[in-house]
Amino acid sequence: MFQTLDHFLKSWEFEADATQKLLNSLTDESLKQEITSQNWTLGRIAWHTVAAIGIITSNTDLTFQAPAEDYPVPTSAQFIADSYHQASNAFVQALKTQWTDHTLQERINFIGQQMPNGSLLMFLIQHQNHHRGQMTVLMRQAGLTVPGIYGPAKEEWAKFGLEAPKM
């Protein structure tokens, strides 16, 4: 659980930048990539990640502009990436102007359970990270280069003068 807005905002800045890098790497064609016809496509997961910022925080008193629905899925990768950038920035501005550290202790109902806003913010980051992991697998299957997040991606080791780990 986050105890201060500053701590959350520093974490969000890194995580949002990482998510933005992934979304910026998508192509319109890659949005159709799927594991099976019974699972979400890369585009569906990407758009859900955008909309989740507003959906997850909808039971709080925060007000900001963000997509409120994660379906239907846009067909433009650029639109998805731009929408994430806008939603994330609006979310950060709302936090800075509408909440205080004290607000993080206030409890809300989220998916049938009571939790402090600080825990909800942790859930938001973890939820986003979960879907980023799914996206990286689908991106590889779609033939895209995956940017490194918590370390270099396979294609990035050479930038550091190192050989990529053996397969």
Swiss-Prot record:
Q: Which Pfam families match?
A: DinB
Gene3D superfamilies per UniProt: dinb family like domain (1.20.120.450)
Taxonomy of origin reads: Bacteria, Bacillati, Bacillota, Bacilli, Bacillales
The molecular function terms of the Gene Ontology recorded here are: metal ion binding
Entry superkingdom: Bacteria
Instruction: State the name under which the record lists this protein.
Output: Uncharacterized protein YrdA
Note the coiled coil stretches, chain numbering.
none
Give the record's family classification.
Belongs to the DinB family.
Q: Which UniProt keywords apply?
A: Metal-binding
* Binding site residues for a divalent metal cation: 48, 127, 131
Which InterPro entries does the annotation name? DinB (IPR007837), DinB/YfiT-like (IPR034660)
